[in-house]
């Protein structure tokens, strides 16, 4: 875990120890952290923040393909550049098959990671609350995808 992440977690801990409202929003904690001088944007973070905002905007750009499907236009792929892994973005209309395959594999890995973490969280919650009906999560998304595709075709 990075030092910066630990710093952010420490701010949350300090917020809670200060007896401020909980549960709360990240914005409320941010307002408190800025007001109390616990956080300010480091100069090195400005470039990273700008890049993150640009990446978020690129992730939200869509087009309609020839079959009428809403498709994400720009896709990142982790590529080795000058000895460092960097997310390189390309346009789905002009990107190489190799770029798209790497991008899709990377996205799938992220989805699997999210599912794994959800399973750990659900298992932990269930273990901590054995007296309650256990929460069950199905990780086979085939039916969900089929239903969404059927709804798209019906529209």
Task: Put a short name on every predicted segment.
Residues 12-13, 18, 39, 43, ...:
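Generic structural signal for short, flexible, solvent-exposed coil/loop and linker residues
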Residues 10-14, 25-40:
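DNA-recognition alpha helix
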Residues 1-8, 46-155:
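Phospho-regulated, low-complexity intrinsically disordered regions of nuclear gene-regulatory
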Residues 19, 36-41, 57, 61, ...:
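Amphipathic alpha-helical interaction segments
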């Amino acid at each position: 875990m990075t030092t910066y992440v630990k710093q952010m977690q420490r701010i949350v801990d300090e917020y809670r120890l200060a007896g401020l409202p909980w549960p709360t929003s990240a914005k409320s904690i941010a307002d408190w952290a800025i007001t109390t001088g616990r956080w300010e944007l480091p100069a090195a973070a400005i470039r990273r923040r700008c890049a993150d905002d640009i990446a978020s905007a690129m992730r939200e750009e869509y087009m309609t393909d020839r079959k009428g499907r809403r498709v994400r236009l720009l896709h990142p792929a982790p590529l080795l550049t000058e000895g460092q892994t960097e997310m390189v973005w390309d346009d789905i209309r002009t990107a190489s098959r190799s770029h798209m395959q790497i991008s899709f594999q990377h996205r799938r890995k992220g989805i699997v990671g999210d599912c794994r973490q959800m399973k750990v969280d659900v298992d932990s919650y269930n273990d901590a609350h054995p007296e309650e009906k256990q929460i069950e999560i199905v990780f086979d998304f085939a039916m969900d995808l089929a239903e969404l595709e059927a709804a798209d075709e019906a529209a």
